[in-house]
């Protein structure tokens, strides 16, 4: 059946209400001792586990997983000589498959510590309501019995949009998860990744960097949807529009990880600009979007050189480095499914397609799924692409072959085809079994019996 956006909205509203009930009074990451590494951590190898703890996942579902863990691990920023630490959250469903691992890219899209999934997925619905949609997608994998790991890929600098940082920290999160001996996961488990929007940046760069940074990981597929693969094109698309707040978040992430860009912007950005860029480092994405609707970041009140700051050589050098497909060295060596709506009003379709073309030219195996219905905007495609992305990754985890080379596919749907998921997902309720008190994982008959009565 086709689930309308109205039904999806009702599901989301109900989930939000339950998440409010589930909220715990948790210390924010900057006040939580778990996030502070022990002495000597800098000398450890990347991916080394420094701390671990059991946690409850309280966004959407509470206590219905078999277990959940968090790992503090050693990682880096853009280069090997920039050591840092971050956290990944591991969710283990009942009847979990121990030969498969899903790296899930949460689209937190802001730099504040309390926006990271290691906090929002424990605290319930706080200021970051995007966690509701992230959980809905992750539930597809959990219900199928896949262990899910979700790295805080922006690290301590809130590096939203800084792809090399996100990719490295995600790969090290996978390393840490595979090395963790308390969840029964095979050390050579098949690995896939799923990410949309900001999660698409994460997953796209994880795929691109894996060959050079973590070649030992047994990755078999990556899904990246609605991907802002070119940050220059992203800024040009959303500046002055309703989603202009993402400009502030993205600029802050790049500035925090490129010292030469910071040195330049410190000279040309106004005091007001500095205040504007601080906001996404303290607030989550919906607050950021609501703070800056229709703001023109090219205005002289923000930049003394107007729009020229974006095209200053030192800025363009960084943004070119952060454009997927520009460097042949960073070409995925594992099959990729890209999905994008032709009417995407945030992440330009043309830029994502150019990344597809570049990766294909450099020898990658990529499928590009275009949602060609005129209503296929960024938010709509978050929903419509979730099932194809899940099914494609499931095929990879099950060892089904993928067509070599590249191909393009067109999808005319404007809704989500839940029939494609099989009988366990005959209803929207099938995605929300955890909400009804049932255990999360395969082979649970409670809801299915209830639906067939």
From Swiss-Prot:
Q: How is its activity regulated?
A: The activity is significantly increased in the presence of Triton X-100 and partially inhibited by PMSF but unaffected by univalent and divalent metal ions. Activity is significantly decreased in acetate buffer compared to that in citrate buffer at the same pH.
The gene that this protein is the product of is LIP2
What name has this protein been given in UniProt?
Secreted triacylglycerol lipase LIP2
A Pfam family that the UniProt record links to this protein: LIP
Provide a Gene Ontology MF annotation, just one.
triacylglycerol lipase activity
Question: Which cysteines share a disulfide bond?
Answer: 115-284, 360-406
Q: What is its EC number?
A: 3.1.1.-, 3.1.1.3
- Which function does this protein serve? Major secreted lipase involved in Dandruff and seborrheic dermatitis (D/SD) probably via lipase-mediated breakdown of sebaceous lipids and release of irritating free fatty acids. Has triacylglycerol lipase activity and is able to hydrolyze triolein, tristearin, trilinolein, tripalmitoylglycerol and trihexadecenoin. Hydrolyze diacylglycerols such as distearin, dilinolein, dipalmitoylglycerol and dipalmitolein. Shows high esterase activity against 4-nitrophenyl palmitate and 1-naphthyl palmitate but not 1-naphthyl acetate, suggesting that it specifically recognizes fatty acids.
Q: How does activity depend on temperature?
A: Optimum temperature is 30 degrees Celsius.
* Native source species: Malassezia globosa (strain ATCC MYA-4612 / CBS 7966)
Query: Which family is this sequence assigned to?
Result: Belongs to the AB hydrolase superfamily. Lipase family. Class Lip subfamily.
